[in-house]
Regions:
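Domain-level signal for soluble alpha/beta catalytic cores
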Residues: 1-214
Length: 214
């Protein structure tokens, strides 16, 4: 057993660490906490050097995206007639083949874009998301300018995905950011706005700051 006085004495060296919190567990009483409080009276918490990592996840895997991250971009119909046909026909086998090939090639995240002529994107996005999560544990990056399609995909996604993308246009921020907040998604932010790509670096930084502070 330890007395309240000894407990407080043993805790005193930790004052120098400028802890954010100190307390007692089972076995301590109000007297323990009273003396502990006197030890830490006036102690100013320090600033933590620990940075929370930026991660995406599925139920069984996660990816830290703070550094270089390999994103597979083949689940995208742009310039791919065969892929567009597969989407119109809801040929999930073809879509899943593209996913598996990218996983085998070392992709860490899979971009998912199902926007093509003749495709009901809001209806197809959740079907593709669910099909992909049945064959791969990699996180998905939902890629669409259709807000309804994004929400439908986010609703069925298991884990924390990333949305591709938003920019500094207020209309885009107002449409996309609430979805990301609602479903806990990360987001790709592009340092452009209604003026396009600005030549001055400080202007792009200002747009990036506008996105992160929105």
């Amino acid at each position: 057993d330890i007395t309240p006085q000894l407990f407080a004495m043993e805790m005193k060296p930790y004052r120098e660490l400028h802890l954010f919190a100190a307390g007692g567990c089972c076995g301590t009483t109000p007297e323990f906490i009273k003396l502990l409080n006197s030890v830490f009276a006036g102690c100013v918490p320090g600033r933590s050097a620990h940075k929370m990592p930026s991660v995406l996840c599925t139920p069984v895997d996660f990816v830290n995206v703070d550094g270089i991250t390999v994103v597979g971009e083949r689940i995208n119909p742009t310039g791919k007639k065969r892929f567009q046909q597969a989407l119109r026909e809801e040929d999930m086998n073809y879509v899943l083949e593209q996913a598996v090939s990218q996983v085998e090639a070392g992709a860490q995240v899979l971009d998912v874009n199902v926007g093509a002529p003749g495709v009901d994107e809001p209806a197809l996005m959740p079907k593709v998301v669910k099909a992909l999560q049945s064959v791969t544990s990699l996180p998905l990056q939902l890629d669409s300018s259709n807000v309804e399609a994004l929400e439908n995909g986010l609703r069925v996604y298991n884990g924390k995905p990333i949305v591709n993308s938003t920019n500094g246009e207020q209309e885009k921020l107002d449409a996309i950011l609430p979805l990301c907040k609602k479903y806990g998604a990360a987001i790709v932010g592009l340092a452009i706005d209604e003026r396009g790509i600005l030549p001055a670096a400080e202007d792009r930084v200002a747009i990036a700051r506008r996105i992160t502070e929105a």
